[in-house]
Amino acid sequence: MKFPKIYYVLLLSFLLGAERGAELRTRERVLYGKFEARFKPTQGEGLVSSFFIYNDDFPNSDWNEIDIEILGRFPQVVDLNAMSPGSHLRTHYVPFNIHLDYYEYGFEWTPDYVAWFI
């Protein structure tokens, strides 16, 4: 799976009512690499914790994104996605409550594949 150059963006979480989060941008474009973050996902209805990179040139080019998303209402579900035209979202189940502790999340992006890890 090949993606155009992207900006590195990190969004940690939104807290209901307080809407707090973080985003990190670079002026440099990156293409391939290993991306990691250590965080404790937010738990609760309507909350999302995520770690992702995406192409910031939309709509001038196709939307491309690699992400890890954790919905606060599902304690054992993680969405690991490589989104581009024609791609699909992937839901994965883990054998533990993901909201109870800090874990290291990441993905390795190469010219040939994207691999995720927790």
Map each language-model feature to its residues.
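Sec-dependent N-terminal signal peptides
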Residues: P4-F14
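GH16 jelly-roll
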Residues: G17-I118
